[in-house]
């Protein structure tokens, strides 16, 4: 397990920021994944290097018997009873009070970290099918800030040429045995919305993941209340500690049987789960973090749908880089609409937004100006051909 988490941590460390997403995406696939991985390493270190459980055994027990008892209770689960409650004589009732999640905490945390990274894997694998390699083009725009004027203009012209070729590629028919999602992405290339459609789909995937993670957290903890974090905080504010609430109890009970000379002897021992002190803080933090992240991710999804679907938002965004600039003050609204909706289309506007977000306003302005010049040149060329 320790080696597995070591390799997993190395993989997380190798994750790098990309320039084809926004800060909410990074909160999901980078920061949250890193936080959960750190928690998984801390818990696994305590479980597999330290002493996760220690039991109070009868004085007649030898050291090997004590070790056996602790190992057995760790593997077979323990159950919680308030300190002053009587131990039920019915063993079935004891089993109903069992706590069986603490052994699986590192594995569950590793699974959660992996699930948070799945949407960005989907984005990386499928974005190249859209026709526009957003990561490479935006990175080129970022790098152009360090170049001289002539080299920067050549770089921006290269970006503009790639965008034009990708946006105006003819529709290609996919064979029936391809994945439906890939087929849909290729089909949307002809409408210039493939990248936008894929990005919003990934946003939906992030939203579904974080909502599912909240339900997974409550299910894993076996908590009947969906407001686990608020319930724990309320208990702490009212001075109701784990001894009463049973949330991540430090002291539990364990039943086990030992066969001696053909006779079965049943023992009940009291055990200390120090690991639950860490688990309580970790899951309380994650519960609140997940809810905050769910709200931010949902707002980000609605925001991107709004700016991608509402035509006026696209016009206003592109227009601010063309109007008010010397030589572009006379751009009429009809020409702007044709430039945005027939030349750039949704994917072109999406790329400009990413350039503005990661490279800054100046590279975005220069790229928009280059695309506008190319659009005007193409329009004049067609008029001369006629």
Curated annotation (Swiss-Prot):
Keywords: Cell junction, Cell membrane, Gap junction, Ion channel, Ion transport, Membrane, Transmembrane, Transmembrane helix, Transport. InterPro entries: Innexin. The keyword Cytoplasm does not apply. GO terms for cellular component: cell-cell junction; gap junction; plasma membrane. One of its GO terms (biological process) is monoatomic ion transmembrane transport. It is a multi-pass membrane protein. The keyword Iron-sulfur does not apply. Coiled coil: none annotated. The chain crosses the membrane at residues 33-53, 103-123, 197-217, 282-302. GO terms for molecular function: actin filament binding; gap junction channel activity; gap junction hemi-channel activity. Expressed in PLM neurons (at protein level). Expressed in the nerve ring. It is found in: Cell membrane; Cell junction, Gap junction. Belongs to the pannexin family. Structural component of gap junctions. Plays a role in maintaining gap junction activity to promote locomotion. Heterooligomer of unc-7 and unc-9. Interacts with F-actin. This is Innexin unc-9. It comes from Caenorhabditis elegans. The gene is unc-9.
């Amino acid at each position: 397990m320790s080696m597995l988490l070591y390799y997993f941590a190395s993989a997380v460390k190798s994750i790098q920021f990309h320039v084809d997403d926004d800060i909410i995406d990074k909160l999901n696939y980078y920061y949250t994944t890193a936080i959960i991985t750190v928690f998984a390493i801390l818990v696994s270190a305590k479980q597999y290097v330290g002493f996760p459980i220690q039991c109070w055994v009868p004085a007649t027990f030898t050291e090997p018997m004590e070790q056996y008892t602790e190992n057995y209770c760790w593997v077979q689960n323990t159950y919680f009873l308030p300190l002053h409650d009587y131990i039920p004589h019915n063993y079935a009732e004891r089993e109903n009070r069992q706590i069986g999640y603490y052994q699986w905490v590192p594995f569950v945390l590793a699974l959660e970290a992996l699930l948070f990274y799945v949407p960005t894997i989907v984005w990386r694998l499928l974005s190249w099918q859209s026709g526009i390699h957003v990561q490479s083009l935006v990175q080129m725009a970022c790098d152009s800030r360090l170049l001289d004027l002539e080299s920067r203009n050549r770089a921006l012209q290269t970006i503009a040429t790639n965008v034009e070729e990708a946006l105006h590629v003819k529709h290609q028919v996919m064979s029936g045995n391809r994945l439906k999602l890939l087929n849909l992405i290729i089909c949307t290339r002809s409408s210039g919305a493939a990248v936008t459609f894929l990005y919003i789909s990934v946003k939906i995937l992030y939203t579904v993941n974080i909502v599912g993670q909240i339900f997974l957290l409550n299910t894993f903890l076996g908590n009947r209340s969906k407001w686990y974090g608020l319930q724990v905080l309320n208990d702490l504010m009212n001075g109701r500690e784990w001894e009463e609430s049973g949330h991540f109890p430090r002291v539990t009970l364990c039943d086990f049987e030992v066969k001696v000379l053909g006779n079965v002897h049943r023992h009940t021992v009291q055990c200390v789960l120090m690991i639950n002190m860490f688990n309580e803080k970790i899951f309380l933090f994650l519960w609140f973090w997940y809810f905050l992240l769910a709200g931010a991710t949902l707002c980000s999804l609605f925001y991107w749908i709004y700016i991608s679907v509402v035509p006026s938002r696209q016009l206003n965004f592109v227009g601010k880089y063309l109007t008010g600039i010397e030589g572009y003050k006379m751009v009429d609204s009809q020409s702007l609409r044709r430039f945005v909706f027939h030349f750039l289309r949704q994917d072109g506007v999406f790329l400009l937004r990413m350039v503005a977000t990661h490279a800054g306003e100046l590279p975005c302005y220069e790229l928009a100006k280059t695309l506008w010049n190319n659009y005007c040149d193409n329009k004049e060329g067609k008029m001369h051909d006629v």
